[in-house]
């Protein structure tokens, strides 16, 4: 059973303590009524992982844990088998005691694009919205963050996160909660809020931006990464039934339009930090994610278009400040 008690104890002593007015009841309701049918199987995989304290831990350049003495072939096989029980692995990669989890996404490439544009993360309390397996939270800790809190309702991601945490020596500097942002009160408590790969899944993107703003302290920083298309400040793509085979894509603005949206929501010092085409080297099928990936979602005769005929995925990173 995944226990959130450590997180409750941690925030009881800091500026997130007011969250305890609602959070334990939400988590209890989730544990009682909303667990996925495979959750027990996934949580068993976490439970059966060995307790290991890493001799060498690198979160600054990667997410890598090594032991002082190499593990036996049997120990490595046990870890690999249990981690494979948590497939598909989408966000990573992770290198854990000789088990290299080659995830669908090279999330380290995204981090390398984002990191140079951030305010110094040293000592910051961070919220990562739609955090997936938690890869970027570990990189935030590696960059000096005091605490990284991730929210993502996908329960497989929670178990992946807890598995990695266990293999990192039960590190308590990062925590993942199985919630969506609409379940959070206006905490106004985070120095930096990340929303990466979420906005285009929201039916009301401006409401999402307001929700992000409600989590920030005054002068806090928003890091927003999302799909964009080329165009001026009035350009927004509203896909039909699917975009790149995804049904739940609602609005894809230009970077300039997105800048206007942020301004409308009251953000200031808004800047477009990066715009990059998503490549089939960055998102692809691997041994740890064996179903369809980006190459299957692009027009085989024109990789500049999706199979539906829309512009192929391009992503922008925007940085903004809450005044």
From Swiss-Prot:
UniProt GO MF annotations: identical protein binding; methyltransferase activity; transferase activity, transferring alkyl or aryl (other than methyl) groups
Protein name (record): tRNA U34 carboxymethyltransferase
Subunit structure: Homotetramer.
Coiled-coil intervals, chain numbering: none
Pfam families per the UniProt record, alphabetical: Methyltransf_9
Function comment: Catalyzes carboxymethyl transfer from carboxy-S-adenosyl-L-methionine (Cx-SAM) to 5-hydroxyuridine (ho5U) to form 5-carboxymethoxyuridine (cmo5U) at position 34 in tRNAs. Can also catalyze the SAM-dependent methylation of ho5U, with much lower efficiency.
InterPro entries: CmoB (IPR010017), Mo5U34_MeTrfas-like (IPR027555), SAM-dependent_MTases_sf (IPR029063)
Leader sequence segment: none
Enzyme Commission number(s) of this protein: 2.5.1.-
Keyword tRNA processing annotated: yes
Origin superkingdom: Bacteria
Positions of transmembrane segments: none
Biological classification of the source: Bacteria, Pseudomonadati, Pseudomonadota, Gammaproteobacteria, Enterobacterales
GO biological process terms held by the UniProt record: tRNA wobble uridine modification
Keywords: Transferase, tRNA processing
Binding-site positions, carboxy-S-adenosyl-L-methionine: 91, 105, 110, 130, 152-154, 181-182, 196, 200, 315
Listed PANTHER family: TRANS-ACONITATE 2-METHYLTRANSFERASE-RELATED (PTHR43861)
Enzyme category, top tier: transferase
Transferase listed as a keyword: yes
Family: Belongs to the class I-like SAM-binding methyltransferase superfamily. CmoB family.
